Amino acid sequence: MDKTDFYNKIKEFEGFKTHAYKCPAGVWTIGYGRTAGVTSGSVTNREAEESWFQNYVNSLMKEVSQRMTEYGYDLTEYQLQALTSFAYNLGMGNKNKGLIQLVKSGERTIEEISEKIPEYNKGGGVVLAGLVRRRAWEKDLFDGKFEKATISGKSNPTAKDLQLLVNEVSGSDLVIDGKIGKKTITATYNYIMEVFHG
């Protein structure tokens, strides 16, 4: 996912507040979900928070990458972004909370991590719709569902390239004739629906 899109998605989930408030977990929060140095009377503005936000996300991504490498994971860009969003929301944590708990200090497989992400949907012990949506997005990102599609590495793929790709990824048996007819459209549509709606 493009870095700007990634930043914007986290901001969308966090929202923006100029005055300090208590999050569902009871922690004083401000801006785009910042908790460091925030007290009941804290006030901020977008300019200050934009600078903090980008610096913090970049620093956090490096920390997540380093820790996951230490645990022996070889993450894709999308997996790293998903885990960075997760850590931004829940912290790096330890064996009892946050990202470290999610990966079980490196003991979980990539598949197990993917399965566990949606379970972290509570704030103050209550399931929150915003966290359900965020975890679903993080899981999809972690699973690579937002990867940019390339067909045979070509910038201008042909109809035959599309048919070959659809056959490969979906197990379809399209005739490779270069004609985008009803069968090609249906097979492509069905595959897209399966990927994004399971």
Describe the function of each predicted region:
Residues 1-19, 25-27, 34, 38, ...:
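Long, amphipathic alpha-helical surface segments
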Residues 29-31, 82-87, 112-113:
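Structural recognition of the beta-strand scaffold that forms the well-ordered cores
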Residues 55, 59-96:
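Active-site nucleophile-His-acid catalytic modules used for acyl/amide transfer and hydrolysis
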Residues 173:
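Catalytic phosphate/metal-binding cores of nucleic-acid and nucleotide-processing enzymes, i.e., regions
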Residues 176:
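Regulatory/sensor and coupling segments of signal-transduction and defense proteins
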Residues 194-198:
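Intrinsically disordered, low-complexity Ser/Thr-rich linker and spacer segments
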